[in-house]
Amino acid sequence: MRQIIIAGNWKMNASKEATNTLVIGILSGMADVKSKVIVCVPSLYMSQVEVLVVDSQLNLGAQNLNVNKLGAFTGEISADMIKDFGAKYVIVGHSERRSLYGETDEIVAQKVQVALDNNLTPLFCIGELLEDRESNNTKSVVSKQIQVVIDRVGIEAFKNIIVAYEPVWAIGTNVTATPQQAQDTHAFIRSMLAEYDADIAQITSILYGGSMNSRNAAELLNCKDIDGGLIGGASLKAQDFLQICKAG
């Protein structure tokens, strides 16, 4: 039985004060949450959140990492730096990193490998553009993104990878894939993994990352192959986020 995982991606939001308020607000409602909950916060606030979540069931994650251990990479953050703040998770290959910063499937696969090599669990993001879906290319796009990672790290590595399917056309748009559309793609992802190893496919968590919110979370999480959510905007309000966390 796969545990529901809810991961909040704050993106480039919050302030020092807002971070404190938001984390305390989330912690105050965690007593009856059965899901695994992760908050992926801006790197500047990781030390602040590390202190707030100590000895709690709230897990800390980062939003990106550089493939290099250290060096002249201005503005970047390494796996060692992430671990220094007690984080165990890192988002890799988010659609915004792919589209705005030119991260290719190969770069994403390299980041997945670096995360794994450093005992960080990657939240490996995949997904298609609107034109891909309209031209019936969702499966080919998603399968290529997965294949490049399998070729680099092997199917066994998926024991320690969380997959996040994010239909790019449904991110930050208030347009959500129907539960059936989401389930169909999640089922396809699992079937692709099963072609390599059926047991690993069954234990791999596949999160939905397309504008899940407190209104649609329960229906989405009720789908057979949807194991949680990668939450953007709704993770910035404690009560909305908690409602999603409790929906599973």
From Swiss-Prot:
Keyword check for Nucleotide-binding: no
One of the Pfam families matching this protein, by short name: TIM
Enzyme class: isomerase
Gene Ontology biological process terms from the UniProt entry: gluconeogenesis; glyceraldehyde-3-phosphate biosynthetic process; glycerol catabolic process; glycolytic process
One MF annotation (Gene Ontology) recorded for this entry: triose-phosphate isomerase activity
Pathway of action: Carbohydrate biosynthesis; gluconeogenesis; Carbohydrate degradation; glycolysis; D-glyceraldehyde 3-phosphate from glycerone phosphate: step 1/1
UniProt keywords, alphabetically: Cytoplasm, Gluconeogenesis, Glycolysis, Isomerase
Catalytic residues as annotated in Swiss-Prot or TrEMBL: H94 (electrophile), E166 (proton acceptor)
Reaction it catalyzes: D-glyceraldehyde 3-phosphate = dihydroxyacetone phosphate
Family label: Belongs to the triosephosphate isomerase family.
Protein's name according to its UniProt entry: Triosephosphate isomerase
Organism: Ruthia magnifica subsp. Calyptogena magnifica
High-level lineage: Bacteria, Pseudomonadati, Pseudomonadota, Gammaproteobacteria, Candidatus Pseudothioglobaceae
